[in-house]
Amino acid sequence: MAKQRLDTLLVDLELCSSRQQAQRLIRAGEVFVNQQIIDKPGTEVETTLPIHIKARSPYVSRGGEKLFKALTEFEISVAGRVCLDGGISTGGFTDCLLQAGAKRVYGIDVGYGQVDWGLRNDPRVILKERTNLRYLQPEQLYKEGDAAADFAVVDVSFISLTKILPALWELLQLPREAVLLVKPQFEVGRSQVGKKGVVRDPEAQAEAIFQVLQAAQQLNWQYRGLTVSPLLGPAGNIEYLLWLGIDSYIATPNFSQIIQFAQTVREQFTSN
């Protein structure tokens, strides 16, 4: 029987759009060959065996599902807008923005080579890799005559959002909207992070959200909305989506209200 690497076979069978996507699905344990999980992309498999992939995300990564919830729940329209994706990684947020009608997306990441191949070759995506968003200046991102982004989405790790907000403010033009993925484990002190890097205390989660919100308000951003991510982080952390804007008519929640929200969210996740 003929054999082939599983990652290339998935592409040949048009089950994946790129080898990179295939490798990601395989490593995530989402590919079954003859009803068995194969989690190594280089595994040689018989080409005639039945292959099944778990229900796949409509985006290049499941991060897109997180942003989709925010866009839907907050009723944010990105159609025809120039957007910025801070911490583009594989490109889930960017894919979501493009599918929602964004005109252009500037993707920024400290890493290199992680972006989905299809997005990398999409003329609507302008990549700025090996770049620290915290220190990025507008003149380093935009060419003369280019319209600056007016809407940003941010998903960063191993750095507090409070450190990148000043640069983000300068990179955006009016109406300066932003949706931030708040990851408590990167916002609170080490003493509040439990085993495997998980922040379980709702009050600590609320503190993370409140600190980011306060830092944003110091830059003249205003609160527009808060929701929980529909997906847990890789280690099991509950994550939140914070919507910022200017000239907001929505009352800003106080710390006690955010704690109550985090407690409700915690109860929902633990009861499932």
PLM regions and their residue ranges:
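Conserved class I S-adenosyl-L-methionine
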Residues: 79-89
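A short glycine-rich, Lys/Arg-flanked "PGG" loop and its adjoining helix->strand segment in the class I
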Residues: 162-179
